[in-house]
């Protein structure tokens, strides 16, 4: 399970939870209805299935994302030759701010 927490730091979406104030440490009352024994067993088995497949689903999603990024790179069009009108059109923002850039001149 430690690998999943490490994975979140690589994805960049992790945030730090704010520290709790000690004075605001109040607990509310929770009302729980009694359940039949058969329903309780079904819920537990569903939780066990989701625990086992959660990590597998994470790695399948990561593999799919990696495959998509590789395919996108492979399908990228070729760079235009430097100094050509196509290069100046593609990199117009660079050529306007820095006209001496290598892509804008021969």
Curated annotation (Swiss-Prot):
Q: List the disulfide bonds.
A: 95-104
Q: Spell out the GO cellular component terms annotated for this protein, sorted alphabetically and separated by semicolons.
A: chloroplast thylakoid membrane; photosystem II
Chief localization class? plastid
Please give the organism.
Petunia hybrida
Output this protein's name.
Photosystem II 5 kDa protein, chloroplastic
Query: Hey, what tissues is this thing expressed in?
Result: Expressed in midvein, lamina and periphery of leaves (at protein level).
Q: Which UniProt keywords apply?
A: Chloroplast, Disulfide bond, Membrane, Photosynthesis, Photosystem II, Plastid, Thylakoid, Transit peptide
Compartment(s) of residence: Plastid, Chloroplast thylakoid membrane
Taxonomic lineage: Eukaryota, Viridiplantae, Streptophyta, Embryophyta, Tracheophyta
């Amino acid at each position: 399970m430690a690998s999943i927490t490490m994975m979140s730091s690589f994805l960049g979406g992790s945030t730090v939870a704010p520290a709790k104030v000690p004075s605001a440490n109040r607990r509310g009352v929770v009302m729980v209805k009694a359940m039949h024994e058969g329903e309780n067993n079904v819920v537990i088995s569903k939780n066990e299935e989701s625990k086992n497949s959660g990590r597998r689903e994470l790695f399948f999603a990561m593999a799919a994302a990696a495959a998509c990024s590789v395919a996108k790179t492979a399908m990228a069009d070729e760079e235009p030759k430097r100094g050509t009108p196509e290069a100046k059109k593609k990199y117009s923002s660079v050529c306007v701010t820095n006209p001496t850039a290598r892509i804008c001149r021969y």
